[in-house]
Amino acid sequence: IVKYLYETQKSSVAHIKRINMRMESNFMHLDVQSRSSLDIIPSLYGVLNFTKTTMGARLLKAWLESPLCDIAAIEWRQELAGEFFADLNLRRQCAERLGGIYDMERIMSRIALKNCNPRDIIALKKSFDEIKKLSSLIESCRADSRLREFFGGAGDFSGLSELIGRAVKDDPPLSVRDGGIIKEGYDEELDGVNKIAHNSKEWLLNLEQNEQKRSGIKSLKIKYNRVFGYYIEITKANLGAIPENYIRKQTLANAERFYTPELKEMESQILNADERQKKLEYELFIKLVEEIAAHSERIYHAARAIAVIDVLASFAEAAAKYDYVKPEITCGDEIEIFEGRHPVVENRMNYMGFINNDTMIGGGHSHVQILTGPNMAGKSTYIRQVALITLMAQTGSYVPARKAKIGLCDRIFTRIGASDNLAAGQSTFMVEMIETANILNNATPRSLIILDEVGRGTSTYDGLAIAYAVIEFILSGGGKLLDGARTLFATHYHELTVLDKTFSKV
């Protein structure tokens, strides 16, 4: 994989420190259509996002798009989120500390690629300082705290923070080539160059005064021009008093210009001081970056831990603000939701006037539910609500309900809305049939299937026939491929309600 990336990206892949193997069976499958229909990003993400770091926000998106199918992992997330939920003071103090932590993952990637700037390094130092405070805060949790156990290995970066503090100015320029980065006292050679650059006028004045005393020539002057550089100018009346080490440089009508080995050396230092300063600072900066890069694995580990803490604290904040509850996750086939609410619609209504709903699918209840009702009755909202609550539960989040018990779902399939694909030459009906066929061919007994108005893209009776056939196929188990798949089917075809007379699962 790394070789492939190196060949295709045409750049260094040094920032990739490890590749984690992902077992697909441990994650819920959400296809593009389901993600779009449920509007996970940005709508659900917007409701749950109380993260304080860029890393946490990025991880929250990843978790919402890949819910878990591992009960132990889900319960671990619930337990840590529960600690934040139960302690408002801990939640607020952690949020304050997290707010001062920068995007360490991206900074470390730039460091690995040697594409970072001085402000990245200062941002890293500030992050290290906040991590230390956050670590102290979490260490104050009870001894058996899972949160304390998890974050205890995040690492102490006091040494790196102190090194950066000694080396880099608090408000450095953006470009590493501009100089003005390294603090005074960090490097002796650089201090000498800086002293030359900053104190050259004072040094030249002292040299002029010393040469006046040594030669006894009061009119002796040290001057500069771009052609000849620095020189000592003496009038012709005083030529007899010049010291032996003076070397003639130029003859004028009324004066002679000289230089000394000392002045020549200092001239070179003064004229090259700015260039040398920038070069030295660049070398010292690169050396500092390499020192930080040597700790990249520890820093990446800490960054990941910070992101996880941020997301779990965000779950707790959402649960406290919106009155969510911790769902029970089981290996069964039930979805039992008492007084469930659509998280996004409820949020947009400012929590006023939303009618909650109970849901009982599987686990002794019917596996297939057919919803009928007039337009604007809330059918689409309800079926999306069930899917979102299931998804949130398997993400490790609390859910909008009074009580919830969710049997693991390996996939969520949706067929919602009407749209065509003109670029592919597909009509609205064609798109609808392709998506429905995809569901019927790929769903499993542990899937959750959401179907809204299947058959709407054609004539009434043809649509009714299609809807009837789809439900019948699901109820018959599709040749056992999806026997027991939990299904919500919203429709205007009231004729479908007779199916409960034929099938016990409706």
Language-model segments: residues:
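Charged catalytic and DNA/RNA-contacting regions of genome-maintenance
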Residues: I1-E83, E96-G99, D103-S109, C116-Q209, ...
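Short hinge/gating elements
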Residues: L44-N49, L60-E65, V176-E189, R248-R257, ...
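ATPase nucleotide-binding head domains, primarily ABC-like/P-loop NTPase cores
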Residues: F50-T53, A57-W63, T235-E267, V308-V506
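Flexible, glycine/threonine-enriched loop-and-boundary segments that flank and lead into catalytic domains
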Residues: E202-I222, D323-V325, H342, N350, ...
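Extended, charged coiled-coil "arm/hinge" scaffolds of SMC/Rad50-like chromosome-maintenance ATPases
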Residues: L252, E256-E290
